């Protein structure tokens, strides 16, 4: 099963109180693997499948940590496109007791990679034009 799309760090600030613009309230801040493709892959792994990730991750310390987290979960990262010039993508959200207040998706590395994340489907690692991938694909609907 291929999971194509965003794999990034989710940074989530959660307050247990309602929030309005400008509020400063106590809460918890967490960081964990996330992104559409990552969330799908983690779900598939829980059902005993071994998802293959096609994505872009910065070749930096945060990216190394993210790839290690994926590997530890049993996800295949052998075909992830890594760029030493770009940082690992992140998503930051603020949530209150009433739900999402605001979020920012910094997916510039995935956007910069473009169709390079699909190279394994053409260069023989996962398929070629003559012998295309015939398995299932979960595709991040946010890709352009």
Residue ranges of each PLM-predicted region?
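Long alpha-helical scaffolds
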Residues: 26-27, 40
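Positively charged, low-complexity intrinsically disordered leader regions
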Residues: 1-19
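Conserved N-terminal subdomain of the carbohydrate kinase-like
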Residues: 9, 21-24, 31, 46-136
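Catalytic beta/alpha-barrel core
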Residues: 138-143
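Histidine-anchored nucleotide/phosphate-binding helix
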Residues: 38-45
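Short glycine/threonine-rich catalytic loop with a Thr-x-Gly-x-Asp
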Residues: 30-33, 37
């Amino acid at each position: 099963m291929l999971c194509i799309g965003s794999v990034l760090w989710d940074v989530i600030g959660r307050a247990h109180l309602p929030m309005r613009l400008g509020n400063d309230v106590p809460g918890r801040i967490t960081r964990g693997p996330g992104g559409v493709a990552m969330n799908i892959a983690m779900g598939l792994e829980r059902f005993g499948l071994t998802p293959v990730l096609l994505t872009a991750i910065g070749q930096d310390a945060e990216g190394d940590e993210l790839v290690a987290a994926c590997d530890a979960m049993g996800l295949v990262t052998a075909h992830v496109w890594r760029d030493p010039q770009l940082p690992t993508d992140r998503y930051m959200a603020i949530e209150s007791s009433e739900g999402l207040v605001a979020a920012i998706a910094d997916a510039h590395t995935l956007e910069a990679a473009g169709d390079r994340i699909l190279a394994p489907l053409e260069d023989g690692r996962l398929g070629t034009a003559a012998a295309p991938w015939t398995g299932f694909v979960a595709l991040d609907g946010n890709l352009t």
